[in-house]
Design a protein with these regions (language model features):
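FAD-site-proximal beta/loop scaffold in flavoenzymes
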Residues: 642-664, 744-816
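Iron-sulfur cluster-binding cysteine motifs and their immediate structural context
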Residues: 447-468, 489-519, 564, 571, ...
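C-terminal helical cap(s) of enzyme catalytic domains, especially alpha/beta-barrels
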Residues: 88-104, 379-403
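Beta1-alpha1 glycine-rich phosphate/pyrophosphate-binding loop at the start
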Residues: 457-467, 475, 504, 508, ...
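Glycine-rich dinucleotide-binding loop and its adjacent helix/turn
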Residues: 518-534, 592-613, 634-686, 787-798, ...
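Glycine-rich phosphate-binding active-site loops on the catalytic face of alpha/beta enzymes
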Residues: 75-85, 246, 363-390
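A conserved FAD-binding loop/helix module that cradles the flavin
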Residues: 812-837
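Glycine/Thr-rich beta-alpha phosphate-binding loop at enzyme active sites
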Residues: 21-37, 250-346, 381-399, 642
Length: 997
């Protein structure tokens, strides 16, 4: 495929807007912002009914980007930068993909990739389209939005004829061909409008802009910056912003801010800080420009800030340097604003861009900093729809005139940013949220949470029922696949939440909370009604009453099998009941999970240890045996002197002795997994303990514990000692070698090297939490084949061991893991025993309107045990790739007779930025892998995408699938083309012909 975009002619642009709006959307946006009965503000002598809009960048390059922004609520548009290098010459210099915005954003793009005259035409088309949309769709005052041009990068280039002409024609476009064309089309097609009149069209002003933002390259001398701004003020009579760089802060300050906020991994040197404009030169220059503009009755200010150049270290983008933006830039940008506000006493106008979004936009504007433009937040799921929420939020202060920038408010924002979870980097690296599957050509909607769950729970279904207050029904849905709703509702590691699409908004849906609400709210009603599904003439013994054993008992007993569960402990529940502290999960709720299995008829024989499987099986006439013995073999911590207390032994003692274990005052926990966090938190609660230290050979970022577990330990006062490796415990001290981080290893973690430095930590008791192993001797004694790690050799499809009829599940089968994995193991074994599939997939049963109503809205979950209603029901509508495409090149269509929307890629609108690849839940890049509509058949030659192009107006098309081309006629029932793909081609031709330009 080619990265050269084809602009949409104005007649086709307007036709699409009008026809698609009748279908309920505009450029894929199913809702809009309407500025009703608002008193607008003023900026540069013109009305402005909103202080926000898209920044110069991927969201202001094409007419459709501008239209989508306006429809969403943008009212100030900083158009993509124009400079002397343009078109194919510039595109050849931009490495693709050029954007990655999963968390903070990085890009390696520059100015417009269009030719300058094309860019001008796009801006004029966008201008006209927004004007008539405002009137036709009641979006607001047609004269209350503003365009602002961005030009660069040197005075010589700005004075070149093509850029000079661009500036002049943006100032007054009435004599240009594109302006005349747009106006003529509107006048000739007034019959297609309900509200737009001839007078409205005639009133569209040709003075598109009266302001400019100066953009210069890094290293541009202050004299050149001043010369450019002076020229635009004096010669072009434009209100002017000069874009400033975060490098004004100085290297040490910028490095310290980023390190403090968790961005210590972002690499950069002091080169740009020395090479860029220096603050000591900036202030006098800006004061001179401010006075110059004032003398000509023009406004002057700064644009804070440009993106921040950093090094490519982990193949983030195919370039050597990339430009950082988004949340990691906020504190840097606002710190520049603070310095300038202080030194100008608030009189210097600031246009802001640098990590603005819904969570901070109100405070930014209240501080007197506006207009505010943005890019990163628009590149995430929800896309342009995110403008709606922000525009509504700002309505109440819209009319407040600008007086000055309030220094105290700016300082408060900076201070708060250092601990704002929306701005700081999480302690742990982001999990991989992508599936290992490739995106299919059709039916690609998917539910990442269910896909990631080992038992594929119907999360959206029970979540919906919980929010409807139908707890009994919700629990019934859960129990279909999950026999341990209380255990998983309390302490599941919820990998489902890590994959949740809402992570790209703010915080994952609290799936585990919804489950616990259903369990607690539905248990009493559900329990008496649990009846066996039938009678299966089988008898099965289960060894072990932990999560895997209870799960096996539940599944088998429900099916009608006679099940007997044996365990050496007096209390069923395994490690969960006998080891995990009570502050993690109430004991009575563990037993409720046991009761569910008992209600189906499972019989528990506690305090009875089984050592001989063959005898056990014969004595009880068991048709099958499920071994679920857990992983309890210690992984000892070897010290030169002293001994360590085993983590599981301590937790069991802590529970049995009611938190009164003799530990002394100072406790050191060695390890960094979830169990280590439990140990540390339990030790903090233990009688007599004053200090708890957690020692690990790497840093918090590389600790295996889940983010949630880590944060809870930090909040409870556990003292984390990073980069330490213990070697001796004596005289109430633990001696550790200081470790030094080295390069990233194959696991994705940075390797460590031991230094000569020795660190002493006060220590009365050392508790080792460095993992548990499976005791392979149990299997060997029973004639079961094991691996070199002591794990049983199992059949992948059934978890059956080398002994026929004997199955293994849980930690004892695969090593220490999590509860939901134990359930999955047990389920697989039970399916083999029963010879049937357990559980039924249930759709979310929601509506398009409900889902689209949530898209674009950033909302944190309620605190406490409250239902989380923010689910986007991705099994019904995903469309992430459509949301995040700035150019709207991924599009959802409704195929007649097909329930779910289908996604096609539109080649002529794509510049291969790669943003959709980041947010697609599959291990795929939609712009390369979805069925693609090409502008012309010859453009298929520049691409390897499967797709189609129409060759005439009669429905004849060329289609390529799997590299093979064929001719296809719309409606042909005898075609060899797969019917689902034929439906896509037919639907585009019949119902979405506005996509054909």
């Amino acid at each position: 495929m080619s990265d050269i975009m084809t602009p949409i002619p104005f007649d086709r642009l307007m036709n699409r807007i009008l026809v698609e709006h009748q279908q309920g959307a505009v450029f894929g946006m199913q809702k809009c912002y309407q500025a009703k009965n608002l008193q607008p503000n003023t900026l540069f002598g013109r009305k402005l009914e909103g202080q926000i809009g898209p920044a110069a960048g991927p969201n202001t390059q094409l007419a459709q980007n501008i239209v989508a922004s306006y429809y969403g609520g943008a009212r100030f548009f900083e158009l993509k930068t124009v400079q002397k290098m343009d078109g194919r010459e510039l595109a050849a210099c931009v490495a693709k993909p050029c954007i990655t915005a999963e968390d903070e954003c990085y890009n390696c793009e520059w100015s417009t990739e269009l030719e300058v005259p094309q860019a001008f035409a796009e801006y004029v088309k966008g201008w006209f389209a927004c004007k008539v949309m405002a009137k036709e769709y009641d979006l607001g005052d047609p004269d209350a939005f503003q365009f602002n041009i961005s030009v660069g990068y040197d005075l010589e280039g700005i004075k070149l004829p093509k850029v000079d002409r661009f500036i002049n024609e943006m100032k007054d476009a009435k004599d240009t061909e594109i302006f005349k064309e747009c106006k003529a089309w509107l006048l000739a097609n007034l019959d297609r409008f309900q509200k737009v009149t001839k007078e409205d069209v005639e009133a569209i002003q040709s003075e598109i802009i009266n302001s400019v933002t100066v953009s210069t390259l890094h290293g541009c001398p202050p004299s050149e910056i001043e010369a450019i701004a002076s020229y635009l003020i004096q010669e072009k009579h434009l209100h002017t912003f000069v874009k400033c760089n975060p490098t004004l802060l100085g290297y040490e300050t910028a490095r310290a801010i980023l390190d403090e906020m968790g961005y210590d991994y972002i690499a950069f040197t002091d080169f740009h800080f020395k090479d860029d404009l220096q603050y000591s030169d900036a202030v006098p220059m800006l004061k001179r420009l401010q006075e110059l503009a004032k003398s000509l009755n023009l406004a002057f200010g700064v644009k804070i800030t440009n993106t921040f150049p950093v090094d490519v270290k982990n193949n983030e983008l195919p370039s050597q340097e990339m430009y950082m933006s988004g949340k990691s830039l906020f504190a840097l940008s606002m710190s520049v604003a603070k310095m300038l506000t202080r030194d100008f006493n608030g009189s210097l106008r600031i246009s802001f861009s640098g990590g603005a979004d819904y969570f901070n936009i109100e405070r930014i504007v209240e501080a007197g900093i506006w207009p505010v433009t943005m890019a990163t937040t628009l590149l995430k799921t929800g896309g342009y729809l995110r403008f709606i929420q922000m525009a509504e939020l700002l309505e109440k202060n819209l009319a407040k005139p600008w007086e000055k920038v309030e220094l105290s408010l700016v300082e408060k924002m900076i201070a708060d940013a250092k601990s704002d979870k929306h701005l700081v980097k999480p302690v742990k690296p982001l999990p991989n949220r992508k599936s290992d599957k490739k995106v299919p050509l059709v039916d690609c909607y998917t539910m990442p949470c269910r896909d990631r769950c080992p038992i594929h729970q119907d999360i959206t279904s029970y979540g919906r029922l919980v929010n409807e207050g139908k707890f009994q029904e919700a629990l019934e849905v859960i129990l279909d696949k999950n026999p341990l709703p209380f255990m998983t509702g309390n302490i599941c590691t919820h990998t489902c939440q890590s994959a949740c699409t809402r992570n790209h908004y703010e915080t994952d849906v609290q799936i585990r909370t919804n489950k616990l609400i259903a369990a607690r709210g539905g248990y009493d009603a559900v329990l008496p009604g649990l009846k066996q599904e039938g009678s299966v003439q089988k008898k099965v013994g289960v060894i072990g009453a932990g999560p895997a054993g209870i799960s096996a008992a539940f599944f088998l007993a429900r099916a009608g099998v006679e099940v007997h569960v044996y365990d050496k402990d007096a209390v069923a529940g395994g490690v969960v009941a006998n080891v995990i502290p009570g502050f993690r999960i109430p004991a009575e709720e563990i037993q409720k999970d046991v009761n569910l299995a008992k209600q189906y008829g499972a019989q528990f024989h506690l305090g009875q240890e089984v050592s001989d499987i063959d005898a056990f099986r014969k004595e009880n006439n068991f048709d099958a045996v499920v071994v679920a013995i857990g992983a309890h073999k210690e992984a000892p911590l070897v010290l030169e002197k002293g001994e360590a207390y085993n983590a599981l032994h301590f937790l069991a003692d802590f529970k049995a002795q009611d938190g009164k274990v003799n530990l002394g005052k100072n406790v050191v926990v060695v390890g960094a997994g979830n169990t280590a966090m439990d140990v540390a938190r339990a030790a903090k609660r233990n009688a007599g303990v004053e200090n708890v230290y957690l020692v690990y050979r790497r840093t918090k970022r590389y600790m295996p514990a889940d983010q949630e577990e880590l944060e809870e330990a930090i909040e409870e006062g556990v003292n984390f000692q990073e980069l330490l490796a213990p070697f001796t415990h004596e005289n109430s001290k633990l001696l550790c070698h200081r470790m030094v981080l080295s390069d990233v290893d194959a696991s994705g973690r940075r390797s460590v090297k031991e230094s000569d430095e020795v660190v002493e930590i006060p220590c009365d008791t050392v508790i080792a939490s460095i993992g548990e192993k499976v005791d392979g001797s149990f299997y060997e004694k029973n004639g079961i084949a094991v691996t070199d790690k002591g794990l049983p050799v199992l059949k992948k499809e059934s978890n059956e061991t080398s002994v026929a009829g004997v199955y293994a599940a849980g930690d004892g089968a695969f090593g220490a893991s999590v509860i939901v994995k134990a359930i999955a193991d047990a389920k697989l074994a039970c399916e083999a025993i029963l010879n049937k599939t357990i559980g039924t997939d249930r759709p979310s049963q929601t509506t398009d309107e409900k889902i689209y109503g949530k898209k674009g809205n950033l909302v944190e979950p309620e605190k406490g045990l409250n239902p989380d209603k923010r689910c986007l029901a991705c099994d019904h509508i995903c469309e992430n790739c459509c949301d995040v495409c700035p150019n709207r090149a991924n599009f959802a269509i409704k195929v007649p007779g097909v329930e779910m929307h289908q996604i096609i890629h539109v080649d002529y609108m794509c510049n291969e930025c790669g943003n959709c690849e980041t947010f697609c839940p599959y291990d795929s890049a939609p712009y390369k892998e979805k069925f693609t509509l090409f502008h012309r058949a010859e453009e298929m030659e520049d691409s390897t995408n499967d797709g189609f192009a129409f060759v005439d107006n009669d429905g004849n098309a060329i289609v390529r699938v799997g590299g093979e081309k064929m001719n296809y006629k719309v409606g042909d029932k005898n075609t060899k083309l797969f019917y689902r793909l034929a439906e896509l081609v037919d639907t585009v031709y019949n119902d979405y012909s506005y996509l054909l330009i």
